[in-house]
Amino acid sequence: GGLTLQGLDDNAAGLGVMLELAERLKNIPTKYSIRFVATSGEEEGKLGAENLLKRMSAEEKKNTLLVINLDNLIVGDKLYFNSGQSTPSSVRKLTRDRALALARTHGVYAATNPGGNPQYPKGTGCCNDGEVFDKAGIPVLYVEATNWALGKKDGYQQRSKSKAFPDGTSWHDVRLDNQQHIDKALPQRIEHRSRDVVKVMLPLVKELAKAGKA
């Protein structure tokens, strides 16, 4: 789609949520530093994430306690929180499991990969920028909306096939991944899902960074 592709689901909404979190956290002191990063070139081979990792020193890698990957938050049936395959179980509890608990507390429907495909074990995610850091041994929390029960059960098919979304996906399609189409097919989904993600991620990031009072 080039310059005509809005890419609202993939991944303008993810960027918007990240900026909202940055705005809300900017005046709050934290024990652990938070870095907000937008990487490009994911579709061409995770080029931005690879470049970022390559430029990190050994000390920076060691001090990176968690990477949170926000991607494809709108069109998918369900909001998912998944861990990187190399993420230790202790970190999974503090991140993925805590996110699911916060979602329940705030009335947000969320799930984790049920593990229907042996290549993607239960509770883990894959196939986006977070994977670069996962392979480098850095803990990852994937935040996405899709439906891991459909298709090859690999998280690729976001929702059931329909007239509005013939392949059950919207990404990379200039006709489908835009505000006008999504608003018509899924009224108020953009606003509601974006708010839901912030409802969970804001308290989670505050907890993890050991935030003080503004």
Whereabouts are the PLM-identified features?
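Short coil-to-beta-strand
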Residues: G1, T64, I68, F165-S170
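Alpha-helical metal-binding/catalytic segments enriched in His/Glu/Asp
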Residues: G1-K46, M201
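Second-shell loop/turn segments in exported
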Residues: G2-N11, R24, A38-T39, L79-S90, ...
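Metal-dependent peptidase/peptidase-like ectodomains
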Residues: P29, T39-Y142, N147-W148
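His/Asp/Glu-rich mid-to-C-terminal helical/loop segments that flank catalytic regions of hydrolases
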Residues: L150-A214
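Short acidic/His/Gly/Ser-rich catalytic and metal-binding motifs that mark active-site loops
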Residues: G1, V75-L79, K153, W171
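Hydrophobic/aromatic-lined pockets within catalytic cores
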Residues: K26, S57, A209
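Solvent-exposed, polar/charged alpha-helical surfaces in well-ordered, non-transmembrane soluble domains
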Residues: L15-E23, E50, K54, D97, ...
